[in-house]
């Protein structure tokens, strides 16, 4: 990030809250997806990159961690050195494959790939893609079991 404060954005521009955090605290809470994380019911595949100039990287991590703590079905893809939109061809191809696998699993009932069921350890990033399909229970089946057990 640039190191500049982003408060002006919320007070005067894109978010249109029209006041400071201290003047309108409820509007800031309502504007933040973090405070609605407990209401997320749809599986989420998010991409947030470390060079994103539009949204601070820590906000993506914060939201991802909140959803994981709430045991929501969420995956976060990070392409190191990339900004808000992907520029490197290999990363665009990787994102396309992962989106297809994600939607094939949740919309067509296909088996989940390894990257969704077991994840990819950081030390294997770029080496082991995890595209192969998992054996055993799918993510969807595990999520259904978790939901049943909560009731």
Predicted regions and their residues:
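Active-site-proximal cap/loop segments of hydrolase catalytic domains
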Residues: 1-151
């Amino acid at each position: 990030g640039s190191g500049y404060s982003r408060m002006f954005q919320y007070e005067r521009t894109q978010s249109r809250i029209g006041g400071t955090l201290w003047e309108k605290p409820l509007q800031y809470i309502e504007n933040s997806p973090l405070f609605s994380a407990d209401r997320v019911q749809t599986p989420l595949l998010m991409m947030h990159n470390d060079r994103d100039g539009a949204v601070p990287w820590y906000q993506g991590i914060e939201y991802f961690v909140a959803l994981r703590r709430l045991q929501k079905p969420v995956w976060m893809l990070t392409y190191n050195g990339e900004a808000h939109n992907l520029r490197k061809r290999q990363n665009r191809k990787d994102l396309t494959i992962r989106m297809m696998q994600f939607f094939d699993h949740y919309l067509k009932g296909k088996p989940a790939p390894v990257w969704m069921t077991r994840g990819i350890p950081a030390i294997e990033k770029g080496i082991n893609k995890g595209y192969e399909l998992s054996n055993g229970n799918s993510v969807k089946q595990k999520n259904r079991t978790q939901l049943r057990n909560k009731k």
